[in-house]
Amino acid sequence: MRLDLLGPVATRIITYLDSLTWVGMALPLFSLCWAISYARGKAYPTVPGAPVYGYNSRFEPSFMLKSRTYTGFYDILSNGYKMLKDVPFVIPRHDTNINILPIKYLDEIRLMPKHILNSHLVLISQMTPKWTWLQPAADSDLVTRVLLTKLNPDLQKYVDITRLELDSAFKSDFPRHDEEWTEVDFQPLIRRVLTRISAKIFLGEPACLNEDWLRIAIGYTAGALEVTKDLHKFPSWTHFLVAPLLPSRRRLRRELDIAMKIVEKQIQLHEQAEKDGLKNYDTLLDWMLDNCSDKESSVEAMTIFQCFIAMASIHTTEFSLANVLFDLCAHPEWFPVLREELDEVIRVHGNIGHRLPAKQWLQKLEKMDSLLAETLRLCPTMLTSIQRLALEKVQLKDGTVIPKGSRLAWASLHHVTDPEVDGTLAAWDPMRNYRKRHSGSGENLTKFVAGQINESTLGFGYGNQACPGRYFAVNEIKMMLARLLLEFEFKFPEGKSRPKVFFIGEIACLDHDATLMMRNVRTC
């Protein structure tokens, strides 16, 4: 080519291209494809006519709005709720479009079956199951079935088992400081105890005491989130290339391999007990093995189910219990109220599990239950705790069309704190439910308890797909809180105050470095 016939700029470009290696050409090409993919985005379904909300200006590119939803979802949703709470609106993300629906639609969708609107698939899709080995949990409802069919009907039995494991865990894992105030990183302490309890109920011994299992059960959530975060840096069409190269994913696989060996031993114990005619249903793994399909029965699938259970239960329960303690330290006048109630229940009914089964004993703690319900109301584990994936096209009574494949959510936290609904809802009122239970002529005594679902308490979801393990979680939290209040005093370190809840996307988080001052007061 006669370069002298071209202009100087064109000459430089051609000379530069001639000098490039294949790597030098591939990297800019890949970057261009990445930018185009993110700029254009996949056409995720949206409710017809619903406006896209969150742009800072009419000139802001969509990929910038989508990027802001990772750390700015709370602010975008808050402003959208204020302006558009009575109509559907859309918050776009790189991985989906979230269709925010008005609260008025809750009653209409609450009983829709999961083959039409599915909440389970929304939860697990946030962990990119295809690339975090969680696909068996996405394809199966075995975990939900064991909670609804085994755990809940036998809740009293499993709460009693929890009491025994909690006794053991407190003796071995909780520090003793005599009567001197000591600053303690207490969140890892309660996380470990909760992990032991979960493993005892679901896997049994010896797995619940296996240090490798405790580490993996605690860490699998963070590991899967790390893989997901790494993958979200790339367009979805590149994930099959990127995923095998991620160090975070290789680390997760190594942990899964270790977990499989632990679960395999528990499966062997189950099989040997069957051969010996010693069928034992103390663990939920036993029920799962007896009621699973051939596809669900593999060691890897059962291990994934156990990891998914840990993901769905340990960190959420820890988050809720930590928030209760933080609320109490922010309002220390409520410590003596709860301790007086505990002392009275012990005076009348003895220690937990001695004269009454643990579940019935915990039901006597009405003031504690009310305080817990209030903290759960104001500090849900998900900003949009009610979500669905539309597996079929749905038309609502007012003509609103929900397209197949659309992801739906409700601004549940904003609704339960909306001053236009009730001017008192934004304030922490620990006896709110206690007063409601004791209003009237006794007809409300079994209502307004922690874990029950209504339009004022949406932290566990809503309708027929609300969290199936919520009643066990509530009993677990109350039991641990009772033990902590009987044995320890708490306060914030000098100069510290209540840590704020913050959100990464829709997921609620606490400062993991937040500590408390603790000291022994008495021994159970």
Curated annotation (Swiss-Prot):
GO cellular component, one term: membrane
Main location: membrane
Transmembrane portions of the chain: 13-36
GO biological process: secondary metabolic process
Enzyme Commission number: 1.-.-.-
Enzyme class: oxidoreductase
SUPFAM superfamilies: Cytochrome P450 (SSF48264)
Names of the cofactor(s): heme
Pathway field: Mycotoxin biosynthesis
Pfam families attached to this UniProt entry: p450
InterPro entries in the cross-refs: Cyt_P450, Cyt_P450_E_grp-IV, Cyt_P450_sf
GO molecular function: heme binding; iron ion binding; monooxygenase activity; oxidoreductase activity, acting on paired donors, with incorporation or reduction of molecular oxygen
Highest taxon of the lineage: Eukaryota
This protein's UniProt keywords: Glycoprotein, Heme, Iron, Membrane, Metal-binding, Monooxygenase, Oxidoreductase, Transmembrane, Transmembrane helix
Topology in membrane: Single-pass membrane protein
Residues with glycosylation annotation: N291, N444, N454
Subcellular location: Membrane
Amino-acid biosynthesis is among the record's keywords: no
PANTHER family per record: CYTOCHROME P450 (PTHR46206:SF9)
Protein purpose: Cytochrome P450 monooxygenase; part of the core atranone cluster (CAC) which products are predicted to catalyze most or all steps of mycotoxin atranone synthesis, starting from geranylgeranyl pyrophosphate (GGPP). The initial cyclization of GGPP to dolabellane is probably performed by the terpene cyclase ATR13. The Baeyer-Villiger oxidation near the end of the atranone synthesis, which converts atranones D and E to atranones F and G is predicted to be catalyzed by the monooxygenase ATR8. Of the CAC's other predicted gene products, the reducing PKS ATR6 might synthesize a polyketide chain.
Entry's family note: Belongs to the cytochrome P450 family.
Record's protein name: Cytochrome P450 monooxygenase ATR4
Taxonomic source organism: Stachybotrys chlorohalonatus (strain IBT 40285)
Lineage, opening ranks: Eukaryota, Fungi, Dikarya, Ascomycota, Pezizomycotina
